[in-house]
Design a protein with these regions (language model features):
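A structural signal for short, well-ordered beta-strand segments
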Residues: 1, 12-14, 158-164
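Flexible loop/turn segments at secondary-structure boundaries
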Residues: 2-4, 17-18, 32-34, 136-138, ...
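Acidic (Asp/Glu-rich), glycine- and aromatic
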Residues: 2-27, 172
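A short linear-motif detector with a strong N-terminal bias
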Residues: 3-5, 69-73, 82-84, 106-110, ...
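A general secondary-structure signal for short beta-strands and their flanking turns/coil
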Residues: 7-11, 87, 157-159
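Active-site/ligand-binding surface loops and adjacent short beta/alpha elements
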Residues: 17-103
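Active-site pocket scaffolds in enzymes
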Residues: 90-174
């Protein structure tokens, strides 16, 4: 806005295709990704979905694997908060097949939150192995309560940078 401050939330949406049995890894410590506990209004929990959530919380389902994730409908969402505590940059990978990896890297001061969003049904097969964000995808009020809502001064701008792509087996990512 040219005349008043405005709130800002930004999530870089990259919905990579769901590849059965893919493995994900990240520069974060084990356990940094946690299952989202809130249930958004657009999600209608089924018995199977509730059981999947219980299995995730019990450690029976690996947050870094798509093995068995064909049952993730509605979506299963993981979040990692306060990424700057883990370093200046964060890197995430999804090994799609023996021949290549998807990779995403970003600065944690720009994106202090990461979301992993997985959905598999007849219409959508998505493995968003990382969605860099300024806040969780739970809306403005939740971001404000968490202290992650950005307020831009009138006329101010903000720039974000994400590097993502596909690497062949053995190819370096610099």
């Amino acid at each position: 806005s040219k005349y008043q401050s405005m709130p800002l939330q930004y999530i870089c949406h990259m919905n990579y295709a769901f590849i059965p049995e893919a493995r994900m890894s990240q520069s974060l410590p084990d356990g940094a990704f946690q299952l989202r506990r809130s249930v958004p209004n657009h999600v209608a929990p089924t018995r199977q979905w509730l059981r999947i959530n219980e299995d995730i919380l019990a450690g029976k389902i690996d947050a870094d694997s798509l093995v068995g994730a064909e049952a993730f409908d509605p979506e299963i969402v993981y979040v990692a908060d306060d990424l700057p505590q883990y370093g200046k940059t964060a890197e995430f990978r999804m090994q799609a097949r023996a021949h290549h990896n998807f990779v995403t890297r970003f600065r944690t001061d720009q994106f202090p939150v990461a979301t992993r969003w997985i959905l598999h049904n007849a219409d959508q097969r998505v493995a968003a192995y990382v969605l860099p964000g300024t806040s969780r995808p739970e809306g403005r009020l939740a971001a404000e309560a968490a202290g992650t809502l950005i307020h831009l001064d009138a006329g101010a701008t903000r720039t974000f940078s994400v590097t993502t792509g596909l690497l062949a087996q053995g190819e370096a990512f610099d």
